[in-house]
Amino acid sequence: MRDSIMQMCELCGKLTDKLYKVIIEGSEMNVCKECAKFGKSPKTYSRLGKKTIIGKGTITTNKQVKKPIKRRRDIFDTLPMLREDYGDVIREAREKRGLSIEELAKKLKMKASTLQKFERYELEPNEKEIKILEKELKISLTESIGEETSYYGGRDEDGFTLGDFIKIKK
């Protein structure tokens, strides 16, 4: 009698002695007979499509032709962010003009306590307040987030990976 090795289906996890290689959602997988119906045979599947040669030209007829993938732009890449040192910038600009908190608050039509909270980092100004402060004090409280803050992958020597948090049951 022949001993067969039981293998696990990559889709449902069922143990079986025969696996079928199929393409499911663009990924090649080894699956059981029941799950094989959800995929296409790698022999018939083509990412580029079927080509029909007519004379000197080649025409692609399959609808599975993929367009080049463009990098999606994140809306947060272009939004201005409040500077980390906004409180010091506000205080220094106010002191440079020789104004007290109460005098500046009166000019800005703002509460003195609100202005104090900005300077002590207890409260962050909203967009409207940022514009008012920037215009009156002739300062910049925002900075643009550029591509340099994007993460492109790779392992950070000090950082964690998902594998550091996964517990595997045996």
Swiss-Prot record:
One of the record's GO molecular function terms: DNA binding
Disulphide bridges: none
CDD domains: HTH_XRE
UniProt DNA-binding residue ranges: 101-120
Family matches, as Pfam families: HTH_3
Stretches assigned to the HTH cro/C1-type domain: 90-144
Keywords associated with the record: DNA-binding, Transcription, Transcription regulation
Signal peptide positions (record): none
NCBIfam families tied to this protein: multiprotein bridging factor aMBF1
Protein name: Uncharacterized HTH-type transcriptional regulator MJ0586
Organism: Methanocaldococcus jannaschii (strain ATCC 43067 / DSM 2661 / JAL-1 / JCM 10045 / NBRC 100440)
